[in-house]
Regions:
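N-terminal beta1-alpha1 cap of cysteine-dependent amidohydrolase-like domains
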Residues: 1-183, 188-228, 234-269
Length: 269
């Protein structure tokens, strides 16, 4: 029936009257259309946290170490968007580093998750030339690698793996808290994967691989447990987020952003 819809609309109406919570969507200017479903998922998650969410686009191609503090000023959370190609990627690393070192809740999706892994390798593990094989075929530290089954397939977008894949979550992780269950299924396609040869080093330095595909041992979710909320997913949770069933990771991300922002505001007083 219409009951759930009515309840949602009422809740949304109330949320609309709250002080907007600013979330930075860091991405490439020409991908605005591709980010539509992310904007909607963030807005829905806001309603479920009884807050109005203002999604503020931050152009990664213009971000530098010098202007990042100004660009992310007043942001309660940072979402590192998906997207192909090298252009604008250095700006994503700048945003990730700033958010990580200032403990601003951060959510990286697909390429955004890969950027989270690369930034950590460069600035925490000390592999300054770490990269993805997609961006730099000759990188000595390919923390993101092309998938084994893809190596023989050269055409882009040919057979990126797509479909629902099982993923097992580590108990006690932020991802597990969000879903409230250990076994999840998510749909996605990608040609690049986290390089498991580096897994032990990442984990020792504080970034944990908390979502693993049991069949292929692929890392699907990474997070930094000691930060308030710093999570990256290989899959696209925005595609399965709906008005009546908002994706749990978006809801958890906004919840953490609200809590973190309010804490910071209190500290200022």
């Amino acid at each position: 029936g219409l009951g759930p819809w009515r309840a949602f609309l009422e809740r949304r109406h109330k949320a609309e009257n709250t002080e907007p919570l600013h979330i930075a969507l860091v991405g490439k200017y020409d991908l605005q259309d591709a980010y539509k479903s992310i904007r909607e998922a963030l807005s829905q998650a806001g309603t479920y946290n009884d807050r109005k969410v203002s999604v503020d686009f931050v152009n990664s191609e213009k971000l530098t170490e010098e202007n990042v503090a100004e660009a992310l000023k007043g942001m309660a959370g940072v979402l590192i968007g998906p997207g192909f190609g090298e252009r604008g990627i250095s700006g994503k690393f700048v945003a990730i580093k700033y958010a990580r070192t200032h403990d601003i809740p951060t959510f990286g999706i697909c390429l955004g998750m890969q950027c989270i892994a690369i930034e950590f390798a460069r600035n925490v593990l000390g592999y300054t030339d770490a990269d993805s094989r997609e961006m730099n075929e000759k990188t000595p530290h390919n923390v993101i690698d092309i998938m084994e089954e893809q190596k023989s397939i050269t055409n882009m977008g040919g057979t990126m793996r797509l479909g629902a894949y099982e993923c097992i979550l580590q108990k006690g992780s932020k991802a597990y808290e969000a879903y409230g269950t250990e076994h999840i299924q998510e749909r996605h396609r990608h040609r690049y994967e986290f390089n498991n040869q580096y897994k032990a080093e990442y984990e020792a330095a504080g970034m944990k691989c908390v979502g693993i595909n049991p069949e292929s041992d692929l890392v699907e979710i990474v997070e930094i447990p000691k930060l308030k909320w710093f999570v990256g997913t290989q899959f696209h949770p925005e595609y399965s987020s709906t008005v009546l069933n908002p994706h749990p990771l978006f809801v958890a991300f906004i919840k953490a952003s609200v809590e973190s922002f309010e804490e910071k505001e209190k500290a200022k007083k």
